[in-house]
Amino acid sequence: MNKQTSTPSQIHRLQQTIYENLPVGMELYDGDGYLIEINRGGLKMMGVKDKQDMLGINIFENPNIPVEMKRRLRAGENIRFTVKYDFDLAKAHYPTVLSGISYFEITVSVVLDENKEIDKFLFIAQDV
């Protein structure tokens, strides 16, 4: 039996395809809370067409994220919570075509660097 191995390039393309086509929103923030990456699912959930309109927003300035969740993130905790997301509040931070209220289930994984300092925050969100 001939076993085919994948090249690093093929693996990267596969990972990118999965990431872009997941039916959930994925957002990656740097250690200071600034958005550095978002997938198509995340853009759709936020009502934004152009990724550039969202890059650079800060999760700690988002009025829709509860203060307690922000505190826990700063402390380096992995968290999961449901949020009542008000798009009218969000419009002060990014241009969304949505308005009103949605509910999202959000899971956040804290990524640590080699010194065990917060390097990134990975948000996975789904509409509930």
Labelled PLM ranges:
Residues M1-S6, Q10:
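Amphipathic alpha-helical coiled-coil "transmission" helices that mediate dimerization
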Residues T5, D127-V128:
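PAS/PAC or PAS-like capping segment
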Residues S9-G33:
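Sensory modules in modular signal-transduction proteins
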Residues L35-E37:
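Conserved hydrophobic beta-strand signature of PAS-family and PAS-like sensory domains
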Residues N39-G42:
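N-terminal capping loop/helix in small sensory signaling domains highlighted by a polar->aromatic N-x2-3-F motif
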Residues M46-K49, L55-G56, N64:
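Glycine-centered C-terminal helix-capping/turn motifs at helix ends
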Residues E61-G100:
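Terminal output helix/cap of sensory domains in signal transduction proteins
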Residues I106-S109, K116-D127:
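PAS-family sensory domains
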